[in-house]
């Protein structure tokens, strides 16, 4: 049995109940999420439909001019399948207006700005619709630091933040999410041709096996290496986990003597 295998029916029920319970506690009945065309946000959309009903879910698609056309098409597949409310807001003018005077901007800076622009739109619609912003980052991304602080990582609650990427794929198959989204190469689509795995220098499946041992089984690096995992891979993962710890906590506040 694969260490990452889950009882998918139980997990689905657990996540749906998590959403219902926490929306009720917060006094909200509606949700808003960014629908990118990737599998993570698609899965969250399906969970929200099951938890709140299709009429209470607003999916916002926010393409930039360099976004892969497949991303928007795949997002629309989800909207059509779930029959949820949706809106498309182009962010090209907003991003280009800012970078007009920043000619030396790197792809990373532009990608982070796009993520934060999308966050800003989601929270504005949260106010407009009296809805909670629901996050779409998985556990693998969160612990590798593969997110933009106060960008795609910003949300009121996140139903998939304890699921590794492997779990995301498995649960998506269980829920019969369109296969095009499951089989495509994971990409934040922040610039043309970008893929997550190429950028990080690892595969999600490899990372999940290592991270499961470190985080769930509390094994040391030495114990993980003793199981035969590649040292460069493990070092890459541990370095990313350590370097991104600040993203996983609230801002540090200096305490003064009184």
UniProtKB/Swiss-Prot annotation:
GO terms for molecular function: ATP binding; glutaminase activity; metal ion binding; NAD+ synthase (glutamine-hydrolyzing) activity; NAD+ synthase activity. It catalyses: deamido-NAD(+) + NH4(+) + ATP = AMP + diphosphate + NAD(+) + H(+). Its EC number is 6.3.1.5. Signal peptide: none annotated. Mg(2+) binds at residues 40, 141. The keyword Methyltransferase does not apply. One of its GO terms (cellular component) is cytoplasm. Disulfide bonds: none annotated. ATP binds at residues 34-41, 136, 165, 187. Keywords: ATP-binding, Ligase, Magnesium, Metal-binding, NAD, Nucleotide-binding. CDD domains: NAD_synthase. Deamido-NAD(+) binds at residue 116. Catalyzes the ATP-dependent amidation of deamido-NAD to form NAD. Uses ammonia as a nitrogen source. HAMAP family: NadE_ammonia_dep. This is NH(3)-dependent NAD(+) synthetase. The gene is nadE.
């Amino acid at each position: 049995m694969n260490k990452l295998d889950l009882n998918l029916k139980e997990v689905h029920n657990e996540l749906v109940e998590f959403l219902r319970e926490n929306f009720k506690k917060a006094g909200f009945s509606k949700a808003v999420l960014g629908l990118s065309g990737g599998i993570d946000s698609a899965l969250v959309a399906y969970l929200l439909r099951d938890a709140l009903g299709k009429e209470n879910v607003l999916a916002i698609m926010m393409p930039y001019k360099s976004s892969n056309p497949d991303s928007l098409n795949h997002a629309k597949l989800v909207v059509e399948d779930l029959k949820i409310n949706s809106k498309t807001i182009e962010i090209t003018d907003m991003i280009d207006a800012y970078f007009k005077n920043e000619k030396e901007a790197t792809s990373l800076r532009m990608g982070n700005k796009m993520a934060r622009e999308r966050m800003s739109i989601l929270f504005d619609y949260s106010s407009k619709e009296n809805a909670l912003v629901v996050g779409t980052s998985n556990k693998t991304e969160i612990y590798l630091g593969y997110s933009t602080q106060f960008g795609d990582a910003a949300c009121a609650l996140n139903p998939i933040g304890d699921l590794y990427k492997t779990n995301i794929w498995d649960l998506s198959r269980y829920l019969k999410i369109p296969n095009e989204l499951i089989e495509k190469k994971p990409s934040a689509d922040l610039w043309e041709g970008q893929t997550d795995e190429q950028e990080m220098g690892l595969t999600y499946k490899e990372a999940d096996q290592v991270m499961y041992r470190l985080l769930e089984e509390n094994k040391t690096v030495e114990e993980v290496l003793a199981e035969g995992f590649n040292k460069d891979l493990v070092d890459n993962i541990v370095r990313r986990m350590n370097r991104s710890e600040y993203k996983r906590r609230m801002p540090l506040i200096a305490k003064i003597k009184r």
